[in-house]
Swiss-Prot record:
It comes from the Eukaryota. GO terms for cellular component: mitochondrial small ribosomal subunit; mitochondrion. One of its GO terms (biological process) is mitochondrial translation. Keywords: Mitochondrion, Ribonucleoprotein, Ribosomal protein. InterPro entries: Ribosomal_uS10_dom, Ribosomal_uS10_dom_sf, Ribosomal_uS10m. The keyword Ribonucleoprotein applies. Component of the mitochondrial ribosome small subunit (28S) which comprises a 12S rRNA and about 30 distinct proteins. This is Small ribosomal subunit protein uS10m. PANTHER family: MITOCHONDRIAL 28S RIBOSOMAL PROTEIN S10, SMALL RIBOSOMAL SUBUNIT PROTEIN US10M. It comes from Drosophila melanogaster. It is found in: Mitochondrion.
Length: 173
């Protein structure tokens, strides 16, 4: 656990320094080589605005509930360090059981059978009010640290602007 916290602290410090040490781009430049001073050339086009997401729902599947619980703690702690609003974290009480019945001998003795059972445990986590860059960084970080035997499925809900034709009420005839 201490190892995870150490890596998490280093990761959050790296993100904070990356935010503030990116080079500034000039909005316009002055061209003085042609003899005429004051010619302004336009700068590079402005970057696209970051997408906004209202909710990120993560579903974890695994065979060991203790590993799922530990990984949930790890992911929520990482979200707190990145400033992501944590929602509800929960798991169903019962696991999903899958049973297979096979014959002990392939050719004879139908009375002698063996049963195998696989139990799949689920865990759900919700996070709210994310930007696109924060969401990508967070998902990449938790996917890289996903333990063996655990499957992760993420579904995101994007916020979009209301179309122009729906903003104005219809005119009365």
């Amino acid at each position: 656990m201490k190892m995870h916290m150490k890596h998490l602290d280093l990761y959050s410090q790296a993100i904070k320094t990356l935010r503030w040490t990116q080079p500034m781009r000039a909005l316009s430049t002055v061209n003085t080589s042609s003899g005429v001073q004051g010619n302004l050339s336009p700068a590079a086009p402005a970057p696209e605005p970051d997408k906004l997401y209202s909710k990120l729902e993560i579903e974890l599947r695994g065979i060991d509930p203790a590993v799922l619980k530990s990984y949930t703690w790890f992911a929520t702690t990482a979200a707190e360090h990145l400033g992501i609003e944590k929602g509800k974290c929960w798991s169903p009480r019962k696991a999903h059981h899958e049973r297979m019945t096979l014959l002990k001998s392939v050719h004879i003795y139908k009375k002698h059978r063996v049963q195998y059972e696989v139990r799949t445990h689920f865990r759900y986590m919700n996070f709210h009010k994310l930007t696109g860059s924060t969401l990508d960084t967070f998902l990449e970080y938790i996917e890289r640290n996903l333990p063996e035997g655990v499957a992760l499925q993420a579904s995101r809900t994007e916020l979009q602007e209301i179309p122009e034709h729906l903003r104005q009420p219809p005119e009365q005839v």
